[in-house]
Protein backbone atom coordinates (compact mmCIF):
# COMPACT_ATOMS: atom_id res chain seq x y z
CA UNK A 1 0.00 0.00 0.00
CA UNK A 2 1.25 3.44 -0.94
CA UNK A 3 0.50 6.84 0.55
CA UNK A 4 1.59 10.19 -0.86
CA UNK A 5 2.27 13.04 1.55
CA UNK A 6 2.34 16.66 0.40
CA UNK A 7 4.63 18.59 2.72
CA UNK A 8 4.69 22.38 2.70
CA UNK A 9 8.02 23.58 3.99
CA UNK A 10 8.42 27.08 5.38
CA UNK A 11 12.20 27.61 5.50
CA UNK A 12 15.21 27.07 3.28
CA UNK A 13 16.53 24.40 5.67
CA UNK A 14 14.30 22.50 8.09
CA UNK A 15 13.58 19.07 9.48
CA UNK A 16 9.91 18.11 9.76
CA UNK A 17 8.92 15.18 11.98
CA UNK A 18 6.65 12.89 9.92
CA UNK A 19 6.65 9.97 12.37
CA UNK A 20 2.96 10.39 13.23
CA UNK A 21 1.95 10.40 9.57
CA UNK A 22 3.87 7.16 9.01
CA UNK A 23 2.35 5.58 12.14
CA UNK A 24 -1.17 6.66 11.13
CA UNK A 25 -0.77 5.13 7.67
CA UNK A 26 0.51 1.90 9.23
CA UNK A 27 -2.66 1.72 11.34
CA UNK A 28 -4.82 2.35 8.24
CA UNK A 29 -3.21 -0.56 6.41
CA UNK A 30 -3.70 -3.11 9.18
CA UNK A 31 -0.23 -4.54 8.49
CA UNK A 32 1.20 -6.21 11.58
CA UNK A 33 4.55 -7.51 10.31
CA UNK A 34 6.73 -6.17 7.52
CA UNK A 35 8.42 -2.91 6.72
CA UNK A 36 7.77 0.73 5.96
CA UNK A 37 9.72 2.50 3.22
CA UNK A 38 9.75 6.30 3.37
CA UNK A 39 11.02 7.85 0.13
CA UNK A 40 11.70 11.40 -1.06
CA UNK A 41 11.83 11.90 -4.87
CA UNK A 42 13.68 15.24 -4.70
CA UNK A 43 17.37 16.04 -5.21
CA UNK A 44 17.43 18.84 -2.63
CA UNK A 45 15.52 17.14 0.19
CA UNK A 46 15.83 13.83 2.03
CA UNK A 47 14.66 11.46 4.74
CA UNK A 48 16.48 10.66 7.98
CA UNK A 49 15.86 8.98 11.31
CA UNK A 50 17.21 10.82 14.32
CA UNK A 51 16.42 12.03 17.83
CA UNK A 52 12.99 13.56 18.33
CA UNK A 53 13.09 14.32 22.06
CA UNK A 54 15.27 17.44 22.05
CA UNK A 55 14.46 20.07 19.37
CA UNK A 56 17.99 21.43 19.64
CA UNK A 57 19.29 18.31 17.87
CA UNK A 58 17.54 19.42 14.65
CA UNK A 59 18.95 22.93 15.02
CA UNK A 60 22.44 21.58 15.67
CA UNK A 61 22.27 19.24 12.68
CA UNK A 62 21.17 22.01 10.32
CA UNK A 63 23.88 24.32 11.66
CA UNK A 64 26.55 21.66 11.19
CA UNK A 65 25.33 20.94 7.65
CA UNK A 66 25.75 24.66 6.91
CA UNK A 67 29.29 24.55 8.28
CA UNK A 68 30.21 21.62 6.04
CA UNK A 69 28.18 22.77 3.01
CA UNK A 70 27.94 26.59 3.04
CA UNK A 71 25.20 27.98 0.82
CA UNK A 72 27.64 30.03 -1.24
CA UNK A 73 31.04 28.74 -2.25
CA UNK A 74 33.34 30.41 -4.76
CA UNK A 75 33.97 27.17 -6.67
CA UNK A 76 30.33 26.07 -7.05
CA UNK A 77 29.24 26.00 -10.70
CA UNK A 78 25.63 24.80 -10.55
CA UNK A 79 23.52 27.38 -12.39
CA UNK A 80 20.69 27.32 -9.83
CA UNK A 81 23.10 28.19 -7.03
CA UNK A 82 21.88 25.41 -4.75
CA UNK A 83 24.84 23.04 -4.73
CA UNK A 84 24.78 23.01 -0.92
CA UNK A 85 21.21 21.68 -0.98
CA UNK A 86 22.23 18.86 -3.33
CA UNK A 87 25.18 17.97 -1.09
CA UNK A 88 23.04 17.92 2.06
CA UNK A 89 20.43 15.76 0.34
CA UNK A 90 23.05 13.29 -0.84
CA UNK A 91 24.50 13.11 2.67
CA UNK A 92 21.12 12.43 4.31
CA UNK A 93 19.78 10.13 1.60
CA UNK A 94 16.47 9.79 -0.20
CA UNK A 95 14.89 6.99 1.85
CA UNK A 96 14.68 5.06 5.09
CA UNK A 97 13.32 1.61 5.95
CA UNK A 98 11.67 0.87 9.30
CA UNK A 99 10.77 -2.61 10.51
CA UNK A 100 7.10 -3.19 11.40
CA UNK A 101 6.28 -5.80 14.05
CA UNK A 102 3.11 -6.32 16.08
CA UNK A 103 1.52 -3.48 14.13
CA UNK A 104 4.12 -0.94 15.29
CA UNK A 105 7.15 0.80 13.83
CA UNK A 106 10.32 -0.50 15.46
CA UNK A 107 12.04 2.77 16.35
CA UNK A 108 14.37 3.50 19.24
CA UNK A 109 13.04 5.35 22.28
CA UNK A 110 14.26 8.73 21.04
CA UNK A 111 13.98 8.17 17.28
CA UNK A 112 11.73 10.00 14.85
CA UNK A 113 11.39 10.04 11.07
CA UNK A 114 12.21 13.39 9.47
CA UNK A 115 11.59 14.97 6.10
CA UNK A 116 14.62 17.21 5.53
CA UNK A 117 14.20 20.32 3.40
CA UNK A 118 17.40 21.87 2.07
CA UNK A 119 16.12 24.26 -0.63
CA UNK A 120 12.78 25.61 0.54
CA UNK A 121 10.29 26.82 1.08
CA UNK A 122 8.41 24.56 -1.31
CA UNK A 123 5.63 22.01 -1.52
CA UNK A 124 7.27 18.60 -1.51
CA UNK A 125 6.16 15.03 -2.06
CA UNK A 126 7.03 12.11 0.18
CA UNK A 127 5.97 8.50 -0.37
CA UNK A 128 5.27 5.91 2.29
CA UNK A 129 5.13 2.28 1.18
CA UNK A 130 3.91 -0.34 3.66
CA UNK A 131 4.94 -3.90 2.93
CA UNK A 132 3.76 -6.89 4.87
Swiss-Prot record:
<dbReference type="InterPro" id="IPR035917">
    <property type="entry name" value="YjbQ-like_sf"/>
</dbReference>
<dbReference type="Pfam" id="PF01894">
    <property type="entry name" value="UPF0047"/>
</dbReference>
<protein>
    <recommendedName>
        <fullName>UPF0047 protein YugU</fullName>
    </recommendedName>
</protein>
<dbReference type="InterPro" id="IPR001602">
    <property type="entry name" value="UPF0047_YjbQ-like"/>
</dbReference>
<comment type="similarity">
    <text>Belongs to the UPF0047 family.</text>
</comment>
